[in-house]
Amino acid sequence: MISSLWIAKTGLDAQQTNMDVIANNLANVSTNGFKRQRAVFEDLLYQTIRQPGAQSSEQTTLPSGLQIGTGVRPVATERLHSQGNLSQTNNSKDVAIKGQGFFQVMLPDGTSAYTRDGSFQVDQNGQLVTAGGFQVQPAITIPANALSITIGRDGVVSVTQQGQAAPVQVGQLNLTTFMNDTGLESIGENLYIETQSSGAPNESTPGLNGAGLLYQGYVETSNVNVAEELVNMIQVQRAYEINSKAVSTTDQMLQKLTQL
């Protein structure tokens, strides 16, 4: 019976982790480009009392054996990179990705990070940057006298300048894809970094080699479904209550033993 206390405790810990993941999803329901997570669990080691297939007598063998589980543990938080909705902003510097791929940005230490958040801005040097101030790569400089900015589905960035009828190309927005998006590491600020599990980054022109297309004047919203998360929350609450009941029931059984 002491084992059942610890087994139920692992269930409580697992459901608390599940609840933390759901709460984080709901907290980021309005975060541009956010991808929801899902907690993944696995059962713990088993106490084998009778090996399956062992002989029970000279003539017979056990068909199933006797194994007692020791609980559950969280093994991963899987990020689901499904497409979010495109929300129109009519801001010429906002760009949404429809399909696969990430924008590449430069971190302060010179390394690269990746994001789905295309709510870009222009800094004091005319550089195209994220809302957090990270420079888009390859670098794109918007002239100070630019009257308008046009970003094509293929990532070509052009500006219209005073005194010039034809637009002038000032840069190219590329997309980076990975063999395993789920293997990317989240570092906050809507950014991911490459890991061994994600595979090497592959930079492509939007619309080529499996990369998505760009939509100017839109941002990609979070792919969190509030109704689905609330249903998951109810399931977690019930599972937590059941494990709590297992703890209290075991405690009552132990009390009965001590009264004998």
From Swiss-Prot:
One of its GO terms (cellular component) is bacterial-type flagellum. InterPro entries: Flag_bb_rod_N, Flagellar_basal_body_rod_CS, Flagellar_FlgE/F/G, Flg_bb/hook_C_dom, FlgE/F/G-like, FlgG_G_neg, LlgE_F_G-like_D1. One of its GO terms (biological process) is bacterial-type flagellum-dependent swarming motility. The basal body constitutes a major portion of the flagellar organelle and consists of four rings (L,P,S, and M) mounted on a central rod. The rod consists of about 26 subunits of FlgG in the distal portion, and FlgB, FlgC and FlgF are thought to build up the proximal portion of the rod with about 6 subunits each. It is found in: Bacterial flagellum basal body. This is Flagellar basal-body rod protein FlgG. Belongs to the flagella basal body rod proteins family. Its main location: other. Keywords: Bacterial flagellum.
